[in-house]
């Protein structure tokens, strides 16, 4: 059930052309191995540590390549989601945030790094309490919007729309903006119908707006997706959430 590998993820950075062909090949292999392991985290979460080890090897070859840092941020973020308590999660989200910032320091226009910065900030704000972390919420929105603006069709821009929608859906009034959340989730579902995260969050927005029948249809569609974009997220988080929401609507 592994998700289809996206070849562009393995491209070698432009400056790496000065490296030997052997080193270029090795860097590419590290990325492929790490991606495969991430794609199997739903079967064994220890694969995250194994993927992290490959990215550390990639850093040893190309220590100033921005892409590796946001990929390490992704691993820390996933580990935070699986952590046993809030303290452990918070530490890992901070680690992810710092690595994403390192990526942006090397490449200020990294769509992926800006997405991870915004997403980590959103999670840290959630752990702290929205009203106690207004600065984080504001920064998260700014970084997510910039990620989208830089490359609206990038797969991370699709994800950024969903995280932005969550920031507009979950907080209490007056921070809530269900109209904006509706637009963002509708666009995300349109851009990637197989992204279960956008589907389940779209259903949440519909429920908040009182459109329970449409929410049911979206949840059923989510659960019937045969080839989810990220099968690990679908199995660990999105499908269980969809089932829970659907049970509330029956």
Language-model segments: which ranges?
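Long, ordered, amphipathic alpha-helical scaffolds
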Residues: 202-250
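Short, local alpha-helical segments
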Residues: 185-187, 199-204
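Extreme N-terminal leader/anchor segments
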Residues: 10-67, 216, 244, 250
């Amino acid at each position: 059930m592994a998700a289809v590998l996206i070849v562009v993820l393995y491209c070698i950075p432009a400056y790496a052309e000065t490296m030997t062909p052997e080193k270029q090949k090795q860097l590419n292999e590290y990325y492929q191995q790490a991606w495969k392991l991430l794609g199997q985290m739903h079967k064994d979460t220890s694969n995250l540590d194994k993927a992290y080890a490959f990215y550390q090897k990639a850093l040893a070859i190309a220590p100033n390549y921005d892409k590796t840092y946001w990929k390490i941020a992704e691993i820390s973020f996933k580990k935070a989601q699986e952590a046993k308590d809030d303290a452990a999660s918070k530490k890992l989200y901070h680690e992810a945030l710092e690595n994403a910032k390192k990526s942006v320091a090397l490449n200020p226009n990294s769509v992926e790094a800006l997405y991870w910065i915004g997403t980590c900030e959103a999670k840290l704000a959630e752990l702290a309490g929205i009203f106690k972390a207004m600065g984080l919420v504001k920064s998260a929105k700014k970084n997510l919007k910039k990620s989208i603006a830089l490359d609206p069709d990038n797969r991370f821009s699709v994800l950024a729309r969903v995280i932005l929608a969550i920031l507009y859906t979950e907080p209490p009034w007056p921070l809530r903006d269900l109209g904006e959340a509706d637009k963002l989730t509708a666009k995300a579902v349109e851009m990637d119908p197989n992204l279960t995260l956008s589907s389940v969050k779209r259903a949440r927005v519909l429920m908040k707006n009182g459109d329970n029948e449409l929410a049911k249809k979206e949840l059923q569609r989510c659960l019937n997706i045969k080839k989810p974009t990220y099968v690990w997220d679908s199995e660990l988080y999105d499908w269980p959430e969809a089932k829970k929401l659907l049970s509330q609507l029956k």
